[in-house]
Amino acid sequence: MDKNEFVPSKDQEMAANFKENPSLFLRGNASTGKTTAALLRLETILHSQASGIGESVLVLVPQRSLGSPFQDFLSKQMSMASDQVSVLTMSSLLRRMIDLFWPLLASYQLFKHPYEKPAFLTLETSQFYMSQIVEPMLAQGKFSTVSLPLYRLCSQLVDNLNKSALVGFSHEEIGARLASAWLGDTSRQNVFSDVQEAVTKFRQLCLENNLLEYSLQVELFKNYLWSNQSFQKYIQNQYQHLIYDNCEEDPPYVHDILIDWLPSFKSSLVIFDENSGFRSFLGADPTSALRLSKSTVTTLQTTHNFVSSIPLQELGNCFLNLQNCKVS
């Protein structure tokens, strides 16, 4: 990072100093320099490493696109220490760890062919395999009150599975939870038992054929891998430093994992964007993310906006709080 481009604020300098602030929860509105502070901290960590003997850094982001600033920064570095940095989402970390520790997971005998390599399904391939379950059910008259085309129905069923894993309840409860939330015509209640039948058969298909769709990956990691002592020893030695940006955009299960994981890092920076959590339809939970502040030693609030003018900031505040709207 070119130090001549800007002068870091005191908050950014504080966040960058990983030795004096090894466990920091950084929060503030958009455009207050939080990600820039994270880049400064990453630069400080890399420059502190002896040549060729770097400590590993995990940069965790909720969406791959949010890792672009870190990827761009690393692409401009000439130091070998930059090779010690991994920019990952929790989803990509899950997949790596499940693939690496598959022999350990196989020992739990959850799958029909535990010693054969698994196939990781994308959203599209998950919907394809779901259609193999749903089509025969449609032929039997199931989902008779649903007017969605097949691909939309399969997409919704896969989404229900994923949401159950993200929020943290069993896929066996999906039908009952949908039924209890339904306020419409009781004649449509039968569709929820059809939903439960479909997701149960789909999960069985996955277990019989070593198919790992997203919700199953999450369950394997949370319920079997994360609690294993051998895995814990490996993962704690794998990364010494953590930078977790936009934690408010991740679902609760990620925050649960990080609450357990944070004490093992040599240094950690968790960044929370105020008035955010825009991916709530994908499971983002800002309220859950705030729990991470209790697992860090220091909390720092950024206030100086580096991008927006004062009138624009006031307008934004009006949208957030109409009763206390003040425009200069």
Identify what each model region corresponds to.
Residues 1-17, 21-25, 30, 37, ...:
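Accessory N-terminal region flanking or inserted into the helicase ATPase core
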Residues 19, 41-45, 70, 261:
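Hydrophobic residues on the short alpha-helix immediately C-terminal to a glycine-rich phosphate/catalytic loop
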Residues 27, 54-162:
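Conserved P-loop NTPase-based nucleic-acid remodeling module centered on helicase motor cores
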Residues 34-43, 254-255:
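Motif I (Walker A/P-loop) of helicase-class P-loop NTPases
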Residues 44-55:
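Post-Walker A helix-loop "phosphate-sensing" segment adjacent to the P-loop in P-loop NTPases
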Residues 45, 94, 247-253, 257, ...:
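Catalytic P-loop NTPase motifs of RecA-like helicase/translocase cores
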Residues 238-250, 268-269, 275:
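SF2 helicase catalytic motif II
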Residues 256-328:
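Conserved RecA-like helicase ATPase core segment
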